[in-house]
Amino acid sequence: MEFDFDWVDAFTDQVFGGNGCAVVHGGAVLPDAICTAYVRETSLVECTFTGPSEIADFKVKYYLASREIPFAGHPTIATVAALRHRGLIGEGPLRLETGAGIVEIEVRGAQIAMTQIAPVFGVEVPVDLVADVGGLEPGDIIGQPQVVSTGLPFCI
């Protein structure tokens, strides 16, 4: 099997700037082991694999070097930019099927606007633990740290 791919720098107009992402067109059919191996080979943080969808315009699968993840922001922008560059989409609304649900996109010229997936709020994290990890004093932290995810969970 052969697949076309694009190496996209999202959030920049500079070559070798921004957030890199490889977009493998038609690759959503590949097994997880191949997708994760591909990410490792590229040395990128995330890569996307597109395919047809019965419920949206395209299906997008997101992978780290170790596993599939439900969604990620900059790879979504990179994927849409690659689809646009190849002439696979035009201007206007676009719906992507992701592991986290349907993502609404609006394409206007070179601008890509994405409606972020609603956050999922996880466990609260002790202030002293976050302070220790960040080399801070507990009093330096304003508010209660909590794990929040719109695709990948982070403590904020």
Give the ranges of each region predicted by the language model:
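Active-site proximal loop and beta-alpha junction motif in alpha/beta enzyme cores
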Residues: M1-F71, I77-I156
